[in-house]
Amino acid sequence: MEQHQGQAGMDLPPGFRFHPTDEELITHYLAKKVADARFAALAVAEADLNKCEPWDLPSLAKMGEKEWYFFCLKDRKYPTGLRTNRATESGYWKATGKDKDIFRRKALVGMKKTLVFYTGRAPKGEKSGWVMHEYRLHGKLHAAALGFLHGKPASSKNEWVLCRVFKKSLVEVGAAGGKKAAVVTMEMARGGSTSSSVADEIAMSSVVLPPLMDMSGAGAGAVDPATTAHVTCFSNALEGQFFNPTAVHGHGGGDSSPFMASFTQYGQLHHGVSLVQLLESCNGYGGLVDMAASGSQLQPAACGGERERLSASQDTGLTSDVNPEISSSSGQKFDHEAALWGY
């Protein structure tokens, strides 16, 4: 009792924590408790772990924020047996893994057993985050502490153990991509900066670009890479549509038409030329039809030479304005283009 009072009167400097090693717990605390049951330590309380639930132990401890230490007498499951009772009112402690040897100067002095608390009853108990390290004496130190130095052996039924109890998190980490996304999300939520390489990698892996062209109505031929690689950003619907010989064949159904042959030849010679530019240079759909009917090659210069003759026609409804800008009659041009594709 005097020893406990002397320890209680110690004034430790701020910042000191009770964080002993396994060997220190055995030799400086448990061995003294086994040798003398009246021994009391400043940082280690006494508790019956079979009558206390793990979540109640922090309030019974003398000190500790994340780890709590207790002296405990082993509770025998049967009066005449040596099996330890590990059950509480809400669950039970289950041993896991192998016992660890604890040495002092190459001499075996104790053993450490790891136990996990399960709620409910075995074998259908639910695992919790509460973990306990149970320390017991072993070897010559055990024999000495059990009372051989006092001339009488102690009963193994009253065996003292020292327990360290703490709680672990049961949150499982996901896949590698989930970790990176969680880290980036947390950093963004805190307003912090993240690595650009990690952010770019996640962005590139999560974004799926849509196809540039609809291949459902295309013919058997392959699509020209020069055509598919071009991405337009025009606000006008007509400006973004470029000539595609494969698509023309797919809609036309064959190569027998001289108009389609001329169009195919033009598409092979002038990649990247929009339909609007073609229509304007030839004064619309009528100019294209006349050029195809006459067997001439579809050259922009030739189409420009026929501008005055074709502008006099009232069937097309197009003006002879040389201004390349699209006028307010864009709806009519869209109708001509629809007729062109359905030719």
Curated annotation (Swiss-Prot):
Alphabetized GO MF terms? DNA binding
Origin species, per record, is Oryza sativa subsp. japonica
Q: What is this protein called?
A: NAC domain-containing protein 4
Task: Note the Gene3D superfamilies from the entry.
Answer: NAC domain
* The keyword Transcription regulation belongs to this UniProt entry's keyword annotation: yes
What residue spans carry the region label Disordered?
A: 304-333
Identify the coding gene: NAC4
Q: What is known of its domains?
A: The NAC domain includes a DNA binding domain and a dimerization domain.
Which GO biological process categories is it annotated with?
abscisic acid-activated signaling pathway; auxin-activated signaling pathway; ethylene-activated signaling pathway; gibberellic acid mediated signaling pathway; regulation of DNA-templated transcription
Q: Record keywords: Acetylation included? A: no
What further fact does the record state?
Answer: The gain-of-function mutant plants Ostil1 (T-DNA activation tagging) exhibit increased tiller number, enlarged tiller angle and semidwarf phenotype. Overexpression of NAC4 shortens plant height. Plants overexpressing NAC4 exhibit early leaf senescence.
Q: In which tissues is it expressed?
A: Expressed in roots, tiller buds, stems, leaves, lamina joints and the young husks. Expressed in embryos, coleoptiles, radicles, leaf pulvinus, ligules, panicles, palea and lemma, anthers, and the internode of the peduncles. Expressed in young leaves, root meristems, florescence meristems and young spikelets.
Q: Which UniProt keywords apply?
A: Abscisic acid signaling pathway, Auxin signaling pathway, DNA-binding, Ethylene signaling pathway, Gibberellin signaling pathway, Nucleus, Transcription, Transcription regulation
Top-level lineage group: Eukaryota
Tell me, using the record's free text, what induces this protein.
Up-regulated during leaf senescence. Induced by salt stress.
SUPFAM superfamilies recorded? NAC domain
**Which segments does the entry list as coiled coil?**
none
Per UniProt, residues of the NAC domain are 12-168
What subcellular locations does the record give?
Nucleus
Q: Explain the purpose of this protein.
A: Transcription factor involved in the regulation of tiller bud outgrowth, but does not seem to regulate tiller bud initiation. Possesses transactivation activity in yeast. Involved in the regulation of plant architecture and grain yield. Acts as a negative regulator of plant height and flowering time. Regulates directly key genes of the gibberellin (GA) pathway by binding to their promoters. Positively regulates leaf senescence in an age-dependent manner. Activates directly the expression of the chlorophyll degradation genes SGR and NYC3.
